[in-house]
Amino acid sequence: VLNDNAPKPPSSIYDLEVPILGICYGQQIMMQMLGGSVISGSGTSEFGKSYVKLNTKSKNIKLLEGLFLKEGKEEVWMSHGDHVATIPKDFEVYGVSENAPFAIIGNEKKHFYGVQFHPEVFHTLNGKVLIKNFLKLSNFSFNWSMQSYLQQSVEEIKIKVGNKKVICALSGGVDSS
């Protein structure tokens, strides 16, 4: 985030009026692009197991439903050198860790959220709950199945191919089809 050539999304992404969840670097770049700041970790890096404590004002945040039920803290997996130093004025702090004062932040009105930890890894014990909550906020449909994917794919192929013939080459390898 702090390098001049650091990758960043187009700023127009924040105008799409869709929920956004920035994870680790994603949180940092979102904060920097929206008016917050990021600083180098000098002495405040976190790698491995950490605990995020809930800000007591954050009890009714939909992103956090079903979380922080045990002593108001969650075990998470951190892996960062840099961290957010300031957040834009329209964001709130939902959770903090020992070295990340903005471990969970959000803007409920815009449905923009950021976490400094990694909910996608199994080391974050309730990471799947957080991700599922975000998907609910995004109006994600939970009815995907391999069968529905297969049906949809077959229909799309029939539309594309019509009455023409096709050749399908398929090997039996696990990762080659």
Regions found by a protein language model. Give the residues of each.
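RNA-binding accessory domains that recognize and position tRNA/RNA substrates
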Residues: V1-D4, K8-P19, Q28, Q32-S177
